[in-house]
Amino acid sequence: MLSWAITFLIIAIIAAVLGFGGIAGTATGIAKILFVVFLVMFIASFFFGRRGRG
């Protein structure tokens, strides 16, 4: 249980550094781009995966 507490402490420290450091705007832009890329990859794999099972 102590390992989980240490893990969440490290995650909270990293989030605080990124949030208070001014990187939040850049990270938001990168996250939007990655979301669109992975959404397109998911849709493509869904359609191409269905064709192979028929």
Curated annotation (Swiss-Prot):
Its main location: membrane. InterPro entries: DUF1328. Keywords: Cell membrane, Membrane, Transmembrane, Transmembrane helix. It is a multi-pass membrane protein. It is found in: Cell membrane. The chain crosses the membrane at residues 4-24, 29-49. Pfam families: DUF1328. GO terms for cellular component: plasma membrane. It comes from the Bacteria. Belongs to the UPF0391 family. NCBIfam families: PRK13682.1-1, PRK13682.1-4. This is UPF0391 membrane protein Pfl01_0044. It comes from Pseudomonas fluorescens (strain Pf0-1).
